[in-house]
Swiss-Prot record:
One of its GO terms (cellular component) is membrane. It is a single-pass membrane protein. It comes from Catharanthus roseus (Madagascar periwinkle). Its EC number is 1.14.14.91. GO terms for biological process: lignin metabolic process. The keyword Cell inner membrane does not apply. This is Trans-cinnamate 4-monooxygenase. It is an enzyme of class 1 (oxidoreductase). GO terms for molecular function: heme binding; iron ion binding; trans-cinnamate 4-monooxygenase activity. Belongs to the cytochrome P450 family. Gene3D superfamilies: Cytochrome P450 (1.10.630.10).
């Protein structure tokens, strides 16, 4: 940074301290704010809390300050909710008041300042995008249309693993093959396309760009520039890389998928009764003038981020827990053989008549919640919550992981014990019928992908347990399940090697 920029930054910082001090005094008189650590001018609680606002750190603050607390992160108010009652207020009772999304310098780049559905503010654009995306992606009709493809992709995974001699001896990093499976599951729905192998050049390029986007967006290192605008000049290099990755990704989506599908549609007659992939419905909405080309590309962006990776994380967590709990793995295998018969491969309709499989999935989503803090909510106007005043445009985080892992509400929550969902928690479902357990959220901004994720999880985990004994690599009794938290995500730190010994029927 040159001296002129540094001088401007320091002058701006000094001015901001004066302004922040005045504003802080005025707000202190006006609002009854939630409790929290004492902030300092300009930086707020950032110097105390740091950038790493993960679910476990915020759970520790909840134990200290209570079910609702306030962090002043630079010039932003961050309100953290950690009880089922207040989660219900934010997500359901006052769902309209708290239904918007906060702005973020990095996500503004990757979503074109909210031209997508997932990260846009609450309003007419969000309602339109949600409606346009629901029919081609998130209905039972879609499940029934594509479940055969999901079953085929799971069968291909089993076949490829059996062909690999390393899998039964030294072990393999199964995640790599499962990643290809998840891309194929979703790209079949989106574009009626699939990738033949992990070495497919287009798949390699797509995976690399999506991975870079996730790394840039999920990291904590840019928080300081988001919380404290006067420090944003220090983010120039980071934001430039974000813009470059965003442009390359959108161009890839356009050139290789959206435009290719347009060409296919122009040469083939498709009426409303013929089978269409999701992008055909999206392009129809564009032709009607409901959305523009950028919206189309940002819908593709959302599916790449919000559907593929999150489901993959959950599959990976489920497999890791089964490797580390062989008694649970055996119990699940016994259920599959008893209900379906030895060697009878699980299909989507079977998943609903296998209660222990359902319990394993629920427990995976409870202990290893893919989006532990949800995407941040925001109130556009001043609001009330838990007896406190919430200033307009506050960032609201619901610590869904803590709701599902609070020892005051759950018996031995640190244990991976699927039986809890067949015993004391037998009435709890993943659809949000209990505000202690919200793996997909609830209300207006809930994740509509639940209708796809649950059957894919059931088919994939079921097929693997049926066909293989899942073991840690030679010389180890367990695999490492250390967590890696992100801005909103929770995935496994190390993609572990596991041994898959084929079973005979």
């Amino acid at each position: 940074m040159d001296l002129l920029l540094l001088e401007k930054t320091l002058l701006g910082l000094f001015a901001a301290i004066i302004v922040a001090s005045i504003v802080s005094k005025l707000r202190g008189k006006k609002f009854k704010l939630p409790p929290g650590p004492i902030p300092v001018p300009v930086f707020g609680n950032w110097l105390q809390v740091g950038d790493d606002l993960n679910h476990r750190n915020l759970s520790d603050y909840a134990k200290k300050f209570g079910e609702i607390f306030l962090l002043r992160m630079g010039q932003r108010n961050l309100v953290v909710v950690s009880s089922p009652e207040l989660a219900k207020e934010v997500l359901h009772t006052q769902g309209v008041e708290f239904g918007s999304r906060t702005r973020n310098v990095v996500f503004d780049i990757f979503t074109g300042k909210g031209q997508d559905m997932v990260f846009t503010v609450y309003g007419e654009h969000w309602r339109k995008m949600r409606r346009i995306m629901t029919v081609p992606f998130f209905t039972n009709k879609v499940v029934q249309q594509y479940r055969y493809g999901w079953e085929e992709e799971a069968a291909r995974v089993v076949e490829d693993v059996k062909k690999n001699p390393e899998s039964a001896t030294n072990g393999i990093v199964l995640r790599r093959r499962l990643q290809l499976m998840m891309y194929n599951n979703m790209y079949r729905i989106m574009f009626d396309r699939r990738f033949e192998s992990e070495d497919d050049p287009l798949f390699v390029k797509l995976k690399a760009l999506n991975g870079e986007r996730s790394r840039l967006a999920q990291g904590f290192e840019y928080n300081y520039g988001d919380f404290i605008p006067i420090l944003r000049p220090f983010l120039r290099g980071y934001l430039r890389i974000c813009k470059e990755v965003k442009e390359r990704r959108l161009q890839l989506f356009k050139d290789y998928f959206v435009d290719e599908r347009k060409k296919f549609g122009s040469t083939k007659s498709m009426d409303n009764n013929s089978l269409k992939c999701a992008i055909d419905h999206i392009l129809e909405a564009q032709q009607k003038g409901e959305i523009n080309e950028d919206n189309v590309l940002y819908i593709v962006e959302n599916i790449n981020v919000a559907a593929i990776e999150t489901t993959l994380w959950s599959i990976e967590w489920g497999i890791a827990e089964l490797v580390n709990h062989p008694e649970i793995q055996k119990k699940l295998r016994d259920e599959l053989e008893t209900v379906l018969g030895p060697g009878v491969q699980i299909t989507e309709p079977d998943t609903y008549k296998l209660p222990y499989l359902q319990a394993v999935i629920k427990e995976t989503l409870r202990l290893r919640m893919a989006i532990p803090l949800f995407l941040p909510h925001m109130n556009l106007h001043d609001a009330k919550l838990g007896g406190y005043d919430i200033p307009a445009e506050s960032k609201i985080l619901v610590n869904a992981w803590f709701l599902a892992n609070n020892p005051e509400h759950w018996k031995k929550p640190e244990e991976f014990r699927p039986e809890r969902f067949l015993e004391e928690e037998s009435k709890v479902e993943a659809n949000g019928n209990d505000f202690r357990y919200l793996p997909f959220g609830v209300g207006r901004r809930s994740c509509p992908g639940i209708i796809l994720a649950l059957p894919i999880l059931g088919i994939t985990i079921g097929r693997l347990v049926q066909n293989f004994e899942l073991l840690p690599p030679p010389g180890k009794s367990k695999i490492d399940t250390s967590e890696k938290g992100g801005q909103f995500s929770l995935h496994i730190l190390k993609h572990s090697t596991i041994v898959l010994k084929p079973r005979t029927f």
